């Protein structure tokens, strides 16, 4: 494979020296970009965009073509590809978000679920990874990703997104045996899926635990973190002669950073409710940190965006081990020039911390 021209993202994840703080944005290929909206219209719908490797490659590269400051590309896909490959029948309803034709509600439902083969059942994702990696031609590293077992389980049990996770939590407390079996199957599936992405060309991987923060402290340890730890222990950590860093991101996980840092990953994603300086004092000796600007700051004027970037950089302080990002995904209404101001500010203002 082509040698990397810009590896500062991978270096920062491993706390190796960098010239400036690297930056990328969760959902950087998304609806805030007019070129993305045009591609989505051409594809017909969101799933057609995900399932066609050429379209997935096109939209993955769009933010990089617009913003030369981006230090990483992230595979354009959806976290719900795994449940779909298990036969749940994923579809999207306008204004409703993701839905499943089948809902998991009993132990028998869970026992019947297959563990998808990443190459046979999710080959379109592997093809997208290899296509994107080829087209990147060493420009920046490519991030692969998956949802966490707990997060995927909530969608499968609820039948879609949820505000209170009533059905998922009822199963967790009322029928923990069933929930553990579901989470175990998902952990096996995620491990195989991420290893497939790494073999196809992903140079780092992130596990999105979007709904881990909805759990109590005890339930988080048992039903979310334990399964992410299992996945991390089964991942390929070196490929093509280079380490493959692993990032864990639990939204709402700021209370549990110490235990997340013990899970074996290289880096922790932080949402915007954490102070990054405090997080560094708590776990910075073990892991690098990724984050953590509130994405709604991007609605503000460029000077306000710049001030918030400066504040977060100062809070983290000197040295490597910080990948700048948002604390969650960029939202569709953000002006593209505001995202550009954010990315420019990170590189410009961070050089002083790496002298």
Curated annotation (Swiss-Prot):
It comes from the Bacteria. Gene3D superfamilies: 3.20.20.210. GO terms for molecular function: uroporphyrinogen decarboxylase activity. Its EC number is 4.1.1.37. It is found in: Cytoplasm. Pathway: Porphyrin-containing compound metabolism; protoporphyrin-IX biosynthesis; coproporphyrinogen-III from 5-aminolevulinate: step 4/4. The keyword Lyase applies. The record marks 78 as: Transition state stabilizer. Its main location: cytoplasm. Keywords: Cytoplasm, Decarboxylase, Lyase, Porphyrin biosynthesis. InterPro entries: UROD/MetE-like_sf (IPR038071), Uroporphyrinogen_deCO2ase_HemE (IPR006361), Uroporphyrinogen_deCOase (IPR000257). SUPFAM superfamilies: UROD/MetE-like (SSF51726). Substrate binds at residues 27-31, 78, 155, 210, 328. Pfam families: URO-D (PF01208). It is an enzyme of class 4 (lyase). GO terms for biological process: protoporphyrinogen IX biosynthetic process from glutamate. The keyword Secreted does not apply. It catalyses: uroporphyrinogen III + 4 H(+) = coproporphyrinogen III + 4 CO2. One of its GO terms (cellular component) is cytosol. Catalyzes the decarboxylation of four acetate groups of uroporphyrinogen-III to yield coproporphyrinogen-III. Belongs to the uroporphyrinogen decarboxylase family. Homodimer. NCBIfam families: hemE. This is Uroporphyrinogen decarboxylase. It comes from Pseudomonas fluorescens (strain ATCC BAA-477 / NRRL B-23932 / Pf-5).
